[in-house]
């Protein structure tokens, strides 16, 4: 093969990383931070508030350079799946004397600025409050608890604990270090999910104090 990576091969992911390694050279010449995971690449650029308009102009330049590199290497940038977000404190955003553009142009697509984006399973909002991530996490964990609850009468305690650990606690544990410093009311929402999980496993009444039961489960 002159271009690309053989699909379905065992070495495919490794070969793809090697194949796209030179992309970092194109990005770094613009002094842009970047992170890549398989075929997912993220670009990050910081600037003082008064330089935001210039930042958008330079952003368009290195996006065009990336597309040129991909065309040269017979790769296609998925314009429709590209996301963009401005991260700032809410207070500073409100104090700016100008408004942010509504979108950036990527190829033939106009990519609107998002209030939140998902990065490897973690949802980041534009003010890094983690509110959206916690809300999504609580919703998905409660959904799994309801599914397990519907068959709880068929399961032993150990089997229920295994299912809860696999489908609920694993979600709470994933990247939980990012929640350090979050307001207590957000952490309380996650604690409530864990409490409900313990009640489901041990068939504990809602009126019972949950701390001893969490300790017995080593949670």
Where are these regions (language model features)?
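Short, charged alpha-helical motifs in flexible N/C-terminal segments and linkers
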Residues: 67-86, 92, 189-219
